[in-house]
């Protein structure tokens, strides 16, 4: 009869989840910070094309 393989402990699983969630939290914080700086106009790492109005 087939027997499932031995699984890793819950503490190892929780440790992996904590690392993943920590990396996700850092990425989310960077995204929020970048979004705020773009909205307030303080972002200096972006170059936006200026659209010139056509005169007739």
UniProtKB/Swiss-Prot annotation:
<dbReference type="InterPro" id="IPR002677">
    <property type="entry name" value="Ribosomal_bL32"/>
</dbReference>
<dbReference type="GO" id="GO:0003735">
    <property type="term" value="F:structural constituent of ribosome"/>
</dbReference>
<dbReference type="InterPro" id="IPR011332">
    <property type="entry name" value="Ribosomal_zn-bd"/>
</dbReference>
<dbReference type="InterPro" id="IPR044958">
    <property type="entry name" value="Ribosomal_bL32_plant/cyanobact"/>
</dbReference>
<keyword id="KW-0689">Ribosomal protein</keyword>
<dbReference type="GO" id="GO:0006412">
    <property type="term" value="P:translation"/>
</dbReference>
<protein>
    <recommendedName>
        <fullName>Large ribosomal subunit protein bL32</fullName>
    </recommendedName>
</protein>
<comment type="similarity">
    <text>Belongs to the bacterial ribosomal protein bL32 family.</text>
</comment>
<keyword id="KW-0687">Ribonucleoprotein</keyword>
<dbReference type="GO" id="GO:0015934">
    <property type="term" value="C:large ribosomal subunit"/>
</dbReference>
<dbReference type="Pfam" id="PF01783">
    <property type="entry name" value="Ribosomal_L32p"/>
</dbReference>
